[in-house]
């Protein structure tokens, strides 16, 4: 509530503690942090790693994220997506103009013109790849706190345009 009125001498009602996190969804690495006491701390994985590599592999045995996915960069690069943040908010035609060599094949048949990377799991949009990374960070935070996240702030680079920010 914006304004709470109470009787003089009465204790204010105890506010419910909510669990919020900050997420840096990076091009190369990502991480999640929260306030612990009066200090902001990054939340490590079960292996003690603060950083999660922003790599997703779509394999026969499921989806792998981070270090597990990195091992497939050479073995299966057509199904291992790295630096997906560069593709967020871009149209299929904009990606063709990049000039970068990308090992992926793109699905140009989507009705909205958005790009999708063709993987063995089907056509995957960049936002879906980002969601896989965010899902791992969310689980990491919820395992840390033993409760569900009530809110999150996700960073975006200053140079992102509106389309990229919305995705």
Where are the regions that the model predicts?
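N-terminal phosphate-binding loop and flanking beta/alpha elements of the actin-like ATPase fold
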Residues: 1-53, 58-167
């Amino acid at each position: 509530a914006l304004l709470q009125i109470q009787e003089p001498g009465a204790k204010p009602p105890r506010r419910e503690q909510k669990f919020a996190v900050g997420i840096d969804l990076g091009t190369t690495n990502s991480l999640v942090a929260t306030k612990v006491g009066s200090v902001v701390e990054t939340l490590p994985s079960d292996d003690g790693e603060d950083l999660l590599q922003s790599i997703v592999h779509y394999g026969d045995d499921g989806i792998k994220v981070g270090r597990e996915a990195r091992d497939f960069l050479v073995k299966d690069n057509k199904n291992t997506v790295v630096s997906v943040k560069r593709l967020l908010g871009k149209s299929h035609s904009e990606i063709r103009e990049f000039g970068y060599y990308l090992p992926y094949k793109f699905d140009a048949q989507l009705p909205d013109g958005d790009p999708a990377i063709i993987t063995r799991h089907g056509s995957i949009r960049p936002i879906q790849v980002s969601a896989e990374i965010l899902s791992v960070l969310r689980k990491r935070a919820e395992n840390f706190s033993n409760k569900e996240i009530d809110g999150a702030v996700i960073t975006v680079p200053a140079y992102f345009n509106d389309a990229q920010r919305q995705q």
